[in-house]
UniProtKB/Swiss-Prot annotation:
Molecular function GO labels: structural constituent of ribosome
Species: Bacillus subtilis (strain 168)
Subunit structure: Part of the 50S ribosomal subunit.
GO biological process: translation
Annotated disulfide bonds: none
InterPro entries: Bacterial_rp_bL28, Ribosomal_bL28, Ribosomal_bL28/bL31-like_sf, Ribosomal_bL28_bact-type, Ribosomal_bL28_sf
SUPFAM superfamilies: L28p-like
Recorded coiled-coil stretches: none
Matches recorded under Pfam families: Ribosomal_L28 (PF00830)
Ribonucleoprotein recorded as keyword: yes
Family listed: Belongs to the bacterial ribosomal protein bL28 family.
Keywords: Ribonucleoprotein, Ribosomal protein
Stated name of the protein: Large ribosomal subunit protein bL28
HAMAP family: Ribosomal_bL28
Originating gene: rpmB
Length: 62
């Protein structure tokens, strides 16, 4: 199972760290994903859901 929100589609994104000399080094930003039990097709299942989806009420825990 990929680390991706099943509701909003949020996932890890890539970019650069920049030093004072503007040198670039690769880094990643992880989405705030929580593993929760929700109803999927009427059955409880553990999936990754973003914290924003939980706070906004787009998904309800079981």
């Amino acid at each position: 199972m990929a680390r991706k929100c099943v509701i909003t589609g949020k996932k890890t994104t890539a970019g650069n760290n920049r030093s004072h000399a503007m040198n670039a080094s690769k880094r990643t930003w992880g989405a705030n994903l929580q593993k929760v039990r929700i109803l999927v097709n009427g059955k409880p299942k553990k999936v990754y859901v973003s914290a924003r989806a939980l706070k906004s009420g787009k998904v309800e825990r079981v």
